[in-house]
From Swiss-Prot:
InterPro entries: Marek_disease_virus_LORF3 (IPR010883). It holds the Pfam family DUF1509. Residues 143-157 have a biased composition (Low complexity). Residues 133-257, 297-368 are annotated as: Disordered. Residues 343-363 have a biased composition (Basic residues). Residues 316-342 have a biased composition (Basic and acidic residues). This is Uncharacterized gene 12 protein. Residues 302-315 have a biased composition (Acidic residues).
Amino acid sequence: MFTGGGTIALIERLATSWLTAIRLILSWHPIHAPNRNQEPLDSLCREGREYIVMISGTVHPRHATWPFWQVMRKCLDWCCAFHPPDDHSCEFGAPRIGIRLEGENHFFAPILGLYSVVMTWSPISCYREFPIRQNSKEPDPQPSTSSEPEPQPSTSSHRNIPVARVRPLVAQQKVPKTRPLDTEIHRPGPIAIQNPTDTDEPELRLNPRPRPGPSGQNTRPRTPTLDLDTVVVRDHPVTHRRPRSPSPPEEDYTNQDENLSYTPQLIHSSPDSEVAEEIYAQPDPWGTQELLLANRERTPDDQTDITDDSADWSEGETRRPSHSEVGERRLSRENNSEDPNRSRSRSRSRERRRRRPRVRPGRRSTATTIRDLVVLGMSSSDDE
């Protein structure tokens, strides 16, 4: 069909076999049972969809459409489905399941849309309707705008019964089809491409910039015809995502001192993560990204929360709070819960006591332990 080699008979058989296969699937489903008419429509549609999936996908994942093609082959072998409307020579009667008799059935309207799609890609000629003037036999491409009253239809006597003779108002004209529907209209293009018709430059309006073709070269998109090689194929997949913004430049923020190192956390930390890129591409009306970039430019000397303890623990270990931090948390918690009616001197003395690092009985600090070991070692060496 794409190359124009399909005949009219083959295309009609293909479209009719599809319609017949769908009718068989719908007739097998118990949705048409008389005792199921009172069930809600959403449950029936859900069961019908599951039933069709079960029919079309129970053989093998690579041959999921095998049952459909088997049904289509049976339909192609069934001659009664492809008889013309005025043919009565079939010995099986005249079931007339062909596509030509299904136009008045609104239940199969979505299925009949496939027939229109098949005919669109076929080289079969189309028929366009033109209005006909009452005083002329030739078709008029434009509708008549004259204000003259339409003539009354003439009457004649047939078996003593007056019969009105009315000329047809519409005539059909056969139009050869040179190419299918324009794929540029139905297929959305890449994002962030300016429309040449919206620009103010007359050169771009008359000669728009060439867009990349199927081979990736800067060639103009060719007009799609019945040849498969001339169908325009987009290099970029259709997506609803916003265009990705470039990642910020990577710089080394490690200080010369080995004990102090500052590695800021960025939103765009992993360039391979599409989620991070999507967040980074969002608009920033509150200036959050500028604040993050400003924090990156700060020197480690400006960081007041970096201590020697934070440089000692490695990346894989979890940091344990120091005794001073625990004491400050307890102090702030107790200060908030204190009664304001107490004397200020008593609260100040308690604050001074709480600020001192508390040493539990039986547990000594690391510095004291090392100093004692040094003293004990020196005393033991003197004794020897």
